[in-house]
């Protein structure tokens, strides 16, 4: 089954590359316009989706102006069941609204495979209210799953743009008897996000703009201090 899993991952990655490349490029162009104006990319997810919000952060070869939004009661290390339950609670995010730091030049990528829970939907609403451009990273395979938000809207109804991961219902790409296993949401989401960042860097290069890209701290005398100082005012975790 191991080889079958790799084959399935390759099949889905090929599907994403073939069907989403135009949208990835369009979204990358939009993000570049905001980055050159001084905006940053903020990413949010709960549970395993938070892993994807952290994937692009402080990453060698990745963009510096990237900031994950941490709400610990929605993260796995504070309790896996709790994070899942909290994501489904109406108005759970409201007490955190004033802590969010969106600028009208920012982009907010909200990550939710199912895209029907109140917390990611509220995050998109709050980001839009602050003037940020909102992008959902989700699987449209779940589009028929009803919203749990009191408005009845799903994440794709709120977000300005959608990036479709094509993750199948139930996440797993393998089955044995009645059991579905072999999840791909993290693999596909990480690949799509890194492809987006790569396209952003390519566009910045084509425009002759400076490239805010982290060099690896494990390869000789690299120094990212200047870039960290530049963006540290927007991200306290980058400060000494």
Swiss-Prot record:
Pfam family, one: SIS_2
GO molecular function (one): carbohydrate derivative binding
SIS domain residues: 31-206
GO biological process: carbohydrate derivative metabolic process
Cited Gene3D superfamilies: Glucose-6-phosphate isomerase like protein, domain 1 (3.40.50.10490)
Listed InterPro entries: RpiR-like_SIS (IPR035472), SIS_dom (IPR001347), SIS_dom_sf (IPR046348), SIS_GmhA/DiaA_subfam (IPR050099), UPF0309 (IPR022951)
SUPFAM superfamilies found in the cross-reference section: SIS domain
Record-stated family: Belongs to the UPF0309 family.
Protein name from the UniProt record: UPF0309 protein in nagA 3'region
Species this chain originates from: Lysinibacillus sphaericus (Bacillus sphaericus)
